[in-house]
């Protein structure tokens, strides 16, 4: 027997799951469509028919909260609770789950249970939160499919606060779990954790120059460095960083101060040991660790000897009670810089009495020095934060209410409108950051509205473009935007360059009287106008088709609209209308994928929509780029037929491309990068070829209508209840 190959891997082609180069590594500049496929049903073990909202109806919320209350004080030997209470740990887990949200693109946040997966499960700032998740496993195991991890993380934080004396503002279930890491979230370009901040600031002296859409000063942090940016203590500089990072999470100064104080009223920081003694984070842990990271195999490493952030100590005298102790500690003492046992910078009081110190987490006969982070000291040295905190200190009830509301906002900001909330503790009060929309009318004559629109004299391009502009703001990351509410008629949307204000004003002046005369909301009329335009274009192509429509959208008022927060939804690029506000570092086709992913569309849906929008003449400003047809206004597959025709050649001409006849050299059309990518990228070309086929004319129309309807209804959560 020949044993020369003994010990070699029997799979001769090697491993495609570890070190082998992927397609994108071989060709790094190739357009990667993975973000459009990341939440396919294939990796989801629940199956296509699973309905979490239906499962929630079976959940015994009172029993669940009772179990969570019991968990808080059920200390486990493998990870003992500080002072016998897991509240601080659970709050940090919930906070860091929700706190990754950023306003710019709505990504991050606690709405998906993403903390279970890389990179978040192994971020330096999330150290030892794997222990919190494992402590929750018996409860998740007990309640099964009736309770998502995403809901459990946030509820555990809520119950932790309640168990320590805070009256919370409320809680909503409804967060659905994802089943693999998110590929669409840009966390930064750095290649190492906690890399120097110069890599994400255009100007280190200007906190506002933090790279968009990022919301943290370093790679691997939720907000700011507790020791000061780049580990250099400077409370005033930290104040600026805190202000910018919390603003990027849609928090104002008062909410920021309340969250900082309320978050550090309970629990402690851990740094009584050496970070070098810790093992790898969960994603890199040895297989026998079973997903446990930061394990200390060299010393005791738990209880009072835990190392997490490197800072060591509690902020208050009673770290398991929600009281006013944070303000008393911060403003009642002078502070000096010291190094923790782990070598981290922290602030300690100069003149504190022993009886005002918190007790040791294991031995109540021992007193320990309290601490403040650089961000805590910012609350004292920044004049705006100080004034707010002193106001809180004088009015405890106001502080508790402000914090409870800010905590609710923090933990629910990415859930979208209130109609998505489920459960017995949903607050009755409507909050402006929920983008409230009044109920719409469903009893009007839809046919009569469509007839009036058709008789208005508005063109297919005007009808379709306006409806598209109204709906395209939807983003599935935080469920904001969309056609419902007709906020396209309000500031700031009515003035966005991408919405062509003059054209928009003209179209709305024609549609508003129709809404008034028929009893329909303007939001419904705008969508119906787009549907009429699509139906007219389909008819011009030889197909009679009715675009599905569901009435019931409402019209939001200016008072119900936080104009500043809606600025983040402005489309700076929209490939569907061949619009680019200005040149960006990223190529237009990458921006197209980003918007497509936010809208919840697939690669084929993106393809059919772009092709249809081009032939209907919906380009921003009426440009001719990509209008590969002689029948503009008809919903034909001409875009794809001519894109894939080898009788044409494509020649760069300044900022665009000429489509020329190969034989004569005559320019037939012009195009942009987002037009040509559908013939250049191998995957998109495969989709384009499907729609270019001779037998695809009807399929193209039907697929366009289906994708169009998906966009128009993306924010109709009332239809999905």
Swiss-Prot record:
UniProt enzyme class: oxidoreductase
Which Pfam families did the record assign?
A: peroxidase
A Gene Ontology CC term for this entry?
cytosol
Q: Does the keyword Metal-binding apply?
A: yes
Q: Where is this cross-link: Tryptophyl-tyrosyl-methioninium (Trp-Tyr) (with M-249)?
A: 95-223
Explain the post-translational modification: Formation of the three residue Trp-Tyr-Met cross-link is important for the catalase, but not the peroxidase activity of the enzyme.
Give the highest taxon in the source lineage: Bacteria
Cofactor descriptive note: Binds 1 heme b (iron(II)-protoporphyrin IX) group per dimer.
Catalysed reaction, written as an equation = H2O2 + AH2 = A + 2 H2O; 2 H2O2 = O2 + 2 H2O
Which of UniProt's keywords are assigned here? Answer: Heme, Hydrogen peroxide, Iron, Metal-binding, Oxidoreductase, Peroxidase
The residues the record assigns to binding heme b are 264
A GO BP entry is:
cellular response to hydrogen peroxide
Entry annotation: catalytic residues:
96 (proton acceptor)
Chain residue numbers at which the record places covalent cross-link Tryptophyl-tyrosyl-methioninium (Tyr-Met) (with W-95):
223-249
Cite the EC number.
Answer: 1.11.1.21
Q: Which cofactor does it need?
A: heme b
Q: Name one GO molecular function term.
A: metal ion binding
* Site note Transition state stabilizer, residues: 92
Which Gene3D superfamilies does the record associate with it?
Answer: 1.10.520.10, Peroxidase, domain 2 (1.10.420.10)
Quote the function comment for this protein.
Bifunctional enzyme with both catalase and broad-spectrum peroxidase activity.
Family membership noted in the UniProt record: Belongs to the peroxidase family. Peroxidase/catalase subfamily.
Subunit-structure text:
Homodimer or homotetramer.
**Know the name of this protein?**
Catalase-peroxidase
């Amino acid at each position: 027997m020949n044993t020369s190959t003994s010990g070699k891997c029997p799979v001769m082609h090697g491993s495609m799951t570890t070190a082998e180069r992927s397609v994108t590594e071989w060709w790094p500049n190739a357009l990667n469509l993975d973000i459009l496929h990341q939440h396919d049903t294939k990796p989801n073990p629940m199956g296509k028919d699973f309905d979490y909202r239906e499962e929630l109806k079976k959940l015994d919320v009172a029993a669940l909260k009772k179990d969570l209350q019991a968990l808080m004080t059920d200390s486990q030997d493998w990870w003992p609770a500080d002072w016998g209470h897991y509240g601080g740990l659970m709050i940090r887990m919930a906070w860091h789950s929700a706190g990754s949200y950023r306003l710019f693109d709505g990504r991050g946040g606690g709405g998906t249970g993403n903390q279970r997966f890389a990179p978040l499960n192994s971020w330096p700032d999330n150290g030892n939160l794997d222990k919190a998740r494992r402590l929750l496993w018996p409860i998740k195991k007990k309640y099964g499919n009736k309770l998502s991890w995403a809901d459990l993380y946030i509820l555990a934080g809520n119950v932790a606060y309640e168990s320590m004396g805070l009256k919370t503002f409320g809680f909503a279930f409804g967060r659905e779990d994802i089943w693999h890491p998110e590929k669409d979230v840009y966390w930064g370009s750095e290649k190492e954790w906690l890399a120097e901040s110069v890599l994400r600031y255009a100007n280190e002296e200007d906190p506002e120059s933090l790279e968009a859409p990022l919301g943290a000063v370093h790679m691997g942090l939720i907000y700011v460095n507790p020791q000061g940016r780049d580990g250099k203590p400077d409370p005033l500089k930290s104040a600026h960083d805190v202000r910018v990072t919390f603003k990027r999470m849609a928090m104002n100064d008062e909410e920021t101060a309340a969250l900082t104080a309320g978050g550090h009223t309970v629990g402690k920081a851990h740094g009584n040991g050496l970070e070098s003694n810790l093992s790898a984070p969960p994603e890199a842990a040895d297989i026998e660790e079973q997903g446990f990271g930061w394990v200390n195999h060299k010393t005791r490493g738990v209880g009072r000897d835990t190392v997490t952030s490197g800072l060591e100590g509690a902020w208050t005298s009673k770290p398991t009670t929600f009281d006013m102790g944070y303000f008393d500690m911060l403003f009642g003492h002078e502070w000096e810089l010291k190094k923790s046992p782990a070598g981290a910078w922290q602030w300690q009081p100069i003149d504190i009495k022993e009886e005002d110190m918190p007790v040791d987490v294991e031995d109540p006969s021992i007193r320990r020095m309290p601490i403040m982070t650089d961000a805590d000291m910012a609350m004292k040295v920044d004049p705006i934060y100080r004034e707010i905190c002193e106001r809180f200190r004088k009015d405890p009830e106001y502080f508790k209410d402000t914090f409870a509301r800010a905590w609710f906002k923090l933990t629910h900001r990415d859930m979208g409108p209130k109609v998505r909330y489920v459960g017995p503790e949903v607050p009755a009060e409507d909050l402006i950051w929920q983008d409230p929309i009044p109920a719409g009318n469903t009893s009007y004559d839809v046919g009569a509205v469509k007839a009036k629109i058709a008789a208005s004299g508005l063109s297919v391009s005007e009808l379709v473009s306006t409806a598209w502009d109204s709906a395209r703001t939807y983003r599935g990351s935080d469920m904001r935007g969309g056609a419902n509410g007709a906020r396209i008629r309000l500031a700031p949307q009515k003035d966005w360059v991408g919405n062509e204000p003059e054209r928009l004003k003209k179209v709305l002046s024609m549609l508003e009287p129709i809404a008034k005369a028929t009893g329909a909301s303007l939001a419904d009329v705008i969508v119906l106008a787009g549907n009429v335009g699509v139906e007219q274009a389909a008819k011009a192509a030889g197909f009679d088709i009715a675009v599905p429509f569901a009435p019931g959208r409402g019209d939001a008022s200016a008072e119900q609209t936080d104009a500043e927060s809606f600025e983040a939804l402005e489309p700076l690029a929209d490939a569907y209308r061949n619009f680019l506000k200005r040149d960006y570092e990223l190529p237009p086709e990458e921006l197209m994928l980003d918007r497509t992913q936010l809208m919840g569309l697939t690669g084929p849906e993106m393809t059919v929509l772009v092709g249809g929008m081009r032939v209907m003449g919906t380009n921003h400003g009426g440009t001719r780029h990509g209008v590969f047809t002689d029948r503009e206004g008809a919903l034909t597959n001409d875009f794809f037929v001519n894109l894939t025709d080898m009788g044409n050649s494509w020649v760069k001409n300044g900022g665009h491309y000429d489509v020329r006849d190969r034989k004569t050299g005559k320019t037939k059309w012009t195009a942009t990068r987002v037009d040509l990518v559908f013939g250049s990228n191998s995957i998109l070309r495969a989709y384009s070829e499907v729609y270019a086929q001779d037998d695809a004319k009807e399929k193209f129309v039907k697929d366009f209508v289906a994708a169009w309807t998906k966009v128009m209804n993306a924010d109709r959560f009332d239809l999905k209840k």
